[in-house]
Amino acid sequence: MKFSLFLNTRQRLPLLSNLLRSIDKTFSYTNDIEILLGIDNDDVETQKFLTHLNFILDDIELCSKINYYSAARPANLHSKMNTLAARTCGDILFVLNDDVEFISMNWDIATVDQLKKRGSAKDNIYYLGSKDTSVDKTTGKNYASFPMLTREAYSTLGYFMSEKFVGLGGDVHLWRIFDSVDRVIDNSEVILDHVRHNTLEKVISPDRVALQM
Protein backbone atom coordinates (compact mmCIF):
# COMPACT_ATOMS: atom_id res chain seq x y z
CA MET A 1 0.00 0.00 0.00
CA LYS A 2 1.28 3.49 -0.82
CA PHE A 3 1.08 6.45 1.56
CA SER A 4 0.97 10.02 0.26
CA LEU A 5 2.13 12.53 2.86
CA PHE A 6 1.58 16.16 1.94
CA LEU A 7 2.05 19.49 3.67
CA ASN A 8 2.76 23.15 3.16
CA THR A 9 6.05 24.53 4.47
CA ARG A 10 7.70 27.94 4.57
CA GLN A 11 11.11 28.97 5.94
CA ARG A 12 11.05 26.45 8.79
CA LEU A 13 14.08 24.37 7.88
CA PRO A 14 14.90 23.01 11.37
CA LEU A 15 11.29 21.87 11.82
CA LEU A 16 11.09 20.42 8.33
CA SER A 17 14.39 18.61 8.83
CA ASN A 18 13.16 17.02 12.04
CA LEU A 19 9.89 15.96 10.41
CA LEU A 20 11.68 14.28 7.51
CA ARG A 21 14.14 12.58 9.86
CA SER A 22 11.26 11.27 11.97
CA ILE A 23 9.60 9.81 8.87
CA ASP A 24 12.89 8.20 7.89
CA LYS A 25 13.21 6.69 11.38
CA THR A 26 9.63 5.46 11.90
CA PHE A 27 8.38 4.35 8.47
CA SER A 28 8.68 0.58 8.06
CA TYR A 29 9.26 0.58 4.29
CA THR A 30 7.02 -2.48 4.16
CA ASN A 31 4.75 -0.07 2.32
CA ASP A 32 5.55 2.58 -0.28
CA ILE A 33 5.62 6.30 0.40
CA GLU A 34 5.66 9.67 -1.33
CA ILE A 35 6.09 13.06 0.32
CA LEU A 36 4.81 16.18 -1.44
CA LEU A 37 5.74 19.61 -0.10
CA GLY A 38 3.99 22.83 -0.99
CA ILE A 39 6.43 25.74 -1.18
CA ASP A 40 5.89 29.42 -1.89
CA ASN A 41 7.58 30.86 -4.98
CA ASP A 42 9.58 33.33 -2.91
CA ASP A 43 10.86 30.72 -0.45
CA VAL A 44 14.29 30.23 -2.01
CA GLU A 45 15.70 29.03 1.31
CA THR A 46 13.51 25.91 1.38
CA GLN A 47 14.01 25.21 -2.31
CA LYS A 48 17.80 25.19 -1.82
CA PHE A 49 17.44 22.99 1.25
CA LEU A 50 15.60 20.34 -0.75
CA THR A 51 18.55 19.97 -3.13
CA HIS A 52 20.69 18.70 -0.23
CA LEU A 53 18.42 16.08 1.32
CA ASN A 54 21.15 13.46 1.09
CA PHE A 55 22.91 15.32 3.92
CA ILE A 56 19.76 15.26 6.05
CA LEU A 57 18.40 11.73 5.63
CA ASP A 58 20.12 8.41 6.16
CA ASP A 59 17.96 6.60 3.62
CA ILE A 60 18.91 7.80 0.16
CA GLU A 61 15.87 6.08 -1.33
CA LEU A 62 13.56 8.30 0.73
CA CYS A 63 15.18 11.37 -0.83
CA SER A 64 13.88 10.25 -4.21
CA LYS A 65 10.35 10.02 -2.77
CA ILE A 66 10.25 13.70 -1.80
CA ASN A 67 8.95 16.23 -4.32
CA TYR A 68 7.72 19.77 -4.08
CA TYR A 69 5.18 21.99 -5.79
CA SER A 70 5.98 25.70 -5.95
CA ALA A 71 3.36 28.40 -6.43
CA ALA A 72 2.40 31.86 -5.24
CA ARG A 73 1.53 32.07 -1.58
CA PRO A 74 -2.21 31.30 -1.25
CA ALA A 75 -4.73 33.46 0.58
CA ASN A 76 -6.43 30.25 1.73
CA LEU A 77 -4.12 27.52 3.00
CA HIS A 78 -6.78 24.87 2.41
CA SER A 79 -6.74 25.60 -1.31
CA LYS A 80 -3.01 24.78 -1.27
CA MET A 81 -3.74 21.53 0.58
CA ASN A 82 -6.28 20.55 -2.06
CA THR A 83 -3.83 21.35 -4.85
CA LEU A 84 -1.26 19.10 -3.21
CA ALA A 85 -3.78 16.32 -2.58
CA ALA A 86 -4.74 16.36 -6.25
CA ARG A 87 -1.10 15.70 -7.17
CA THR A 88 -0.73 12.62 -4.97
CA CYS A 89 -1.00 9.04 -6.22
CA GLY A 90 -1.07 6.96 -3.02
CA ASP A 91 -3.74 4.69 -1.59
CA ILE A 92 -3.86 6.66 1.67
CA LEU A 93 -3.56 10.46 1.79
CA PHE A 94 -2.11 11.91 5.00
CA VAL A 95 -2.08 15.67 5.63
CA LEU A 96 0.63 17.06 7.92
CA ASN A 97 2.21 20.27 9.20
CA ASP A 98 5.91 21.03 9.05
CA ASP A 99 5.96 21.35 12.86
CA VAL A 100 5.12 17.72 13.62
CA GLU A 101 7.33 14.70 14.20
CA PHE A 102 6.36 11.04 14.11
CA ILE A 103 6.62 9.24 17.45
CA SER A 104 5.08 5.84 16.62
CA MET A 105 7.37 3.30 15.04
CA ASN A 106 5.97 1.43 12.01
CA TRP A 107 2.94 3.70 11.91
CA ASP A 108 2.27 2.67 8.32
CA ILE A 109 1.89 -0.98 9.32
CA ALA A 110 -0.43 0.00 12.19
CA THR A 111 -2.58 2.03 9.79
CA VAL A 112 -2.87 -0.76 7.24
CA ASP A 113 -3.73 -3.22 10.02
CA GLN A 114 -6.50 -0.95 11.32
CA LEU A 115 -7.91 -0.54 7.84
CA LYS A 116 -7.93 -4.30 7.30
CA LYS A 117 -9.52 -5.00 10.70
CA ARG A 118 -12.20 -2.31 10.68
CA GLY A 119 -12.59 -1.37 7.04
CA SER A 120 -15.19 -3.88 5.90
CA ALA A 121 -17.00 -1.66 3.38
CA LYS A 122 -16.47 -2.76 -0.20
CA ASP A 123 -16.15 0.82 -1.42
CA ASN A 124 -13.18 1.39 0.97
CA ILE A 125 -14.35 4.92 1.81
CA TYR A 126 -12.72 5.71 5.15
CA TYR A 127 -11.35 8.51 7.29
CA LEU A 128 -8.47 7.40 9.51
CA GLY A 129 -7.45 9.43 12.50
CA SER A 130 -4.20 9.95 14.38
CA LYS A 131 -3.25 11.29 17.80
CA ASP A 132 -1.01 14.24 18.53
CA THR A 133 0.41 16.18 21.46
CA SER A 134 -1.39 19.49 20.86
CA VAL A 135 -2.37 21.10 24.17
CA ASP A 136 -4.78 23.53 22.50
CA LYS A 137 -7.04 20.83 21.08
CA THR A 138 -10.42 20.42 22.80
CA THR A 139 -10.26 17.49 25.23
CA GLY A 140 -12.44 14.51 24.42
CA LYS A 141 -12.99 15.33 20.76
CA ASN A 142 -12.42 12.48 18.32
CA TYR A 143 -11.37 14.50 15.28
CA ALA A 144 -7.75 14.31 14.20
CA SER A 145 -5.62 17.38 13.65
CA PHE A 146 -3.76 15.32 11.05
CA PRO A 147 -6.25 12.98 9.36
CA MET A 148 -5.87 10.43 6.61
CA LEU A 149 -8.32 9.57 3.83
CA THR A 150 -8.34 6.50 1.67
CA ARG A 151 -8.03 7.28 -2.01
CA GLU A 152 -11.67 6.26 -2.45
CA ALA A 153 -12.81 8.63 0.32
CA TYR A 154 -10.87 11.53 -1.16
CA SER A 155 -12.13 10.85 -4.69
CA THR A 156 -15.74 10.57 -3.54
CA LEU A 157 -15.61 13.75 -1.46
CA GLY A 158 -13.80 15.67 -4.19
CA TYR A 159 -11.49 17.58 -1.88
CA PHE A 160 -9.40 17.07 1.25
CA MET A 161 -10.05 20.30 3.16
CA SER A 162 -13.10 22.48 2.65
CA GLU A 163 -12.03 25.88 1.33
CA LYS A 164 -14.95 27.45 3.21
CA PHE A 165 -12.55 27.42 6.15
CA VAL A 166 -9.61 29.76 5.65
CA GLY A 167 -7.57 28.38 8.55
CA LEU A 168 -9.11 26.67 11.56
CA GLY A 169 -12.10 24.34 11.38
CA GLY A 170 -11.34 22.27 8.31
CA ASP A 171 -10.16 19.27 10.32
CA VAL A 172 -13.35 19.19 12.41
CA HIS A 173 -15.52 19.59 9.32
CA LEU A 174 -13.80 16.66 7.60
CA TRP A 175 -14.26 14.40 10.63
CA ARG A 176 -17.95 15.30 10.94
CA ILE A 177 -18.60 14.30 7.34
CA PHE A 178 -17.26 10.79 7.76
CA ASP A 179 -18.48 10.37 11.33
CA SER A 180 -22.03 11.10 10.15
CA VAL A 181 -21.90 8.05 7.87
CA ASP A 182 -19.95 5.85 10.31
CA ARG A 183 -16.78 5.73 8.23
CA VAL A 184 -14.23 6.85 10.84
CA ILE A 185 -11.40 4.55 11.95
CA ASP A 186 -9.77 5.80 15.15
CA ASN A 187 -6.19 4.71 14.38
CA SER A 188 -4.92 6.09 17.70
CA GLU A 189 -1.74 3.99 17.55
CA VAL A 190 -0.33 6.61 15.17
CA ILE A 191 1.01 9.39 17.38
CA LEU A 192 2.60 12.67 16.30
CA ASP A 193 4.42 15.25 18.37
CA HIS A 194 2.97 18.64 17.42
CA VAL A 195 6.18 20.44 18.32
CA ARG A 196 4.96 24.04 18.16
CA HIS A 197 1.76 23.20 20.04
CA ASN A 198 2.87 20.73 22.72
CA THR A 199 3.10 23.33 25.50
CA LEU A 200 0.92 26.31 26.35
CA GLU A 201 3.97 28.60 26.21
CA LYS A 202 4.57 27.66 22.56
CA VAL A 203 0.90 28.08 21.66
CA ILE A 204 0.75 31.64 23.01
CA SER A 205 4.13 32.51 21.46
CA PRO A 206 3.84 31.52 17.78
CA ASP A 207 6.87 31.85 15.56
CA ARG A 208 7.17 34.36 12.72
CA VAL A 209 5.78 32.01 10.07
CA ALA A 210 2.76 31.05 12.18
CA LEU A 211 1.94 34.71 12.77
CA GLN A 212 1.80 35.27 9.00
CA MET A 213 -0.63 32.42 8.36
What kind of feature is each model-predicted range?
Residues 72-79, 85, 166-168:
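A short, glycine-/small-residue-rich helix N-cap motif at loop->alpha-helix starts
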